[in-house]
Amino acid sequence: MLKVSAAAAAALLMAGGAHAAQTGPIGPVFVIAMENHNFTQPKAFNTTQQIEDNPAAPFINSLLKRGHPNARYVSFATNYRNVPPQNGRPIHPSEPNYVWSEAGVHGKLNDNDPYPDNIVNRPSLSAELQAAGMSWKSYQEDTDLLTVNGNLTSTVAPPSLWTVPLVSFSGTSPTYTNAYNGSDQYQYAAKHNPMVFFTATNGGDNIMPSNPESKYYAPLQQLSVDLANNTVAAYNWITPDDFNDMHSALSAGFTYHGVHYVGDAASIAEGDNFLSQVVPMIEASQAFQNGGTIVIWNDETEGEGTVPGKFTSMEIVISRLARGNAFGASVAYTHSSDLRTYQRLFKLSPKQGYAWLGDSANARPLTALFKR
């Protein structure tokens, strides 16, 4: 498990200038990837609903409320936006934003699985972590589950059967019950699993357990086990399935805190419900107590067309090292800011002989969200 001293952590996160050291060591990073909703948007826009002040997202909004117990270790960005268009083209749909989170570039502007032709031949964060001997893990919901008579179950396969999940799948099953929303619907999307788009971290076009990179991927159920055993990686990427990450509404809608939601509101409620269970689980762990940092990250804004930048995207940091008490930072951030921050934190920056990954060279790190 990576540990960085307090003084070093402050220096690594600084954008420049003199700041006092943060208190305590930096521990594991947990990125929880959410989908397709603006944090704030103009009132006239109603195709999708925004997250801030949305009654379907009470847990998220409790994190943003000063004085609320859930907000104790929370800082968030009020000016986090999509990365700028590249060559005149906005960075949509989802997949190029996930690729950007690893490499600072976008790859192909589609949502196809990595093979046969969506591999991105660029250096990436997880590949550099791996080459430097540091640990990373991609936890993906609905993967590596056993089947009975062709039907998916909720039972996790033995670790010896785990794979690199290169292929998307979805459906319903009478022998499957989602642990968070209680439905029989499942949907794994490779486009939301950024590490599978780089050959250094996907092990090639091999969906069998023999793939040497299989050890870096795990079903989401394994997260609670690793937290309990204090064996989480230095860098942990967590992707809920397409219902729990706010991408899609369950076919029957979703009842949450006594209210039945349908459509876009249901997708928000499903994601909020997921976060309300997973975030406290991580916060209760030794890894979090030892300086762990949770980043609730949203892939892209919605509805901006060819002129992005009008709407903001959700970026929430939860850590004992955060400024806390729902501190909102107005510094302009994008996905490149996260990437630059992680390169500094894990000592993979030019100071240690590494090149900045893509657009992270032009970004501000997330310094304003942390104690100084």
Enumerate the predicted regions with their spans.
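Gram-negative bacterial Sec-dependent N-terminal signal peptides
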Residues: 1-19
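N-terminal pro-sequences and low-complexity stem/linker regions of secreted or lumenal proteins
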Residues: 20-372
